[in-house]
Amino acid sequence: MINKNLDANTYSKMANAIRVLTIDAVEAANSGHPGMPMGMADVATLLFSEFLKFDPKNPKWVDRDRFVLSAGHGSMLIYALLYLTGYSDISLDEIKNFRQFGSKTAGHPEYGEIDGVETTTGPLGQGFANAVGMAMAERQLSAKFGKEIVDHNTYCIVGDGCLMEGISHEAASLAGHQRLGKLIVLFDDNGISIDGSTDLTVSDDHIERFKAYGWHTASADGHDFNAVRSVISQAKDSSKPSFLAFKTQIGFGSPNKGGTAACHGAPLGADEIELVRSTLNWSEEPFVIPESIIVAWRKLGEKGGKEEKAWQERLKQLENGQKQSFKNTIKAELNSNVLNALHTKIFCIVVDTMKSSIGCFYVGTVL
């Protein structure tokens, strides 16, 4: 999705809406992680405005782009984005009930609770590996049914913690080997962890590490919309998976706590929030977003709706047999032969039967 009708000033206001919703929700809950959403708000705003293909009115659209927040502790980033773009599954009341018992807006995003959350991301690095799997699935489906039907990207936001986890190393190696060019990882390179500077815990050169895995790599200022646009555009043109390191300030907009571990995993406090509002030139009451900013965000989803309708027309053009095969593959329903095989046959027979039923199927063994 390309939408270049908005200027940097409008983007800044849209990003600030993410920031104030974040600090208000975390403050109300007296718990949460405001720093990452505040720091990555500019990158996320540009991504959703100009690149991400999505339709809030049909969140299960098969050919939507996938957006995975692997750094799930910064969950207010995705909750704010889904609310602002018009997903009906998340209301302002849910934002106000952030991290409360029984609320959809848990401290870490949970799959199945809110449309638009593609996978549960609690353990760091898990979302990264999930995103690799999603990109593998996209390529296999596209090869079978054609780019007119399956042609989408997978975007994944990660932090330093995700990249420290062993699972990210294994998944990154696999993605590079598979040359998953539709996978774009956005690294929040803020140099801060919960304990302080990341120098205390890690000294990896992440860019060189991902180059060694066979990835396309780039770095940019995460608060410069033109720079963000440039590197994402280059990533979309690459035949390799892309690792984009965005230098950001954790807690961007917070005069006293921004750039420090103090805003990583704790509320900013009432006094600092007032200073943030002043710094961002934001005069609204807590949880109030100006109508003009809401309208700007909601328009993004309207274009996605048009793309989804065009896709539906292409789907209708498939031959009946191919169309039914596509629907069966997406449903991934197992027939009775599979269930019988699970009880009576050895592993290979089970796999062969599942493959004949589902059509698109990955399996691996360690012997």
List where the protein language model places each region.
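Thiamine diphosphate
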Residues: M1-T154, V295-L367
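Glycine-rich ThDP/TPP pyrophosphate-binding loop and its adjacent helix/strand module
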Residues: P56-K57, E113-I114, T119-K299
